[in-house]
């Protein structure tokens, strides 16, 4: 089973040119130790998780990874992508419910 990606992804500036290669590497288990993925959280009461792409080397994490909504080159950049998502959710819905905003945009 492959990874689930949200389109369009939230990503760092300059990653647009590399995103197809990044996706291919992650889909085929090549991994990348310098990437962080922002995913929909599976934990009750939480909205998003930030996961190191290196963790995808573990089968259990790879199989259970929820939808990927963002890609970043560092943990700090991943936090910036979450802030971007929050700003978009607030502008579109007036509430800070990022998860609901992203799920509704996906449909």
Please name every model-derived segment.
Residues 31-67:
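Short aromatic-glycine-(Arg/Gly/Cys) micro-motifs in beta-strand/loop hairpins
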Residues 1-26:
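Negatively charged, low-complexity tracts enriched in Asp/Glu with abundant Ser/Thr
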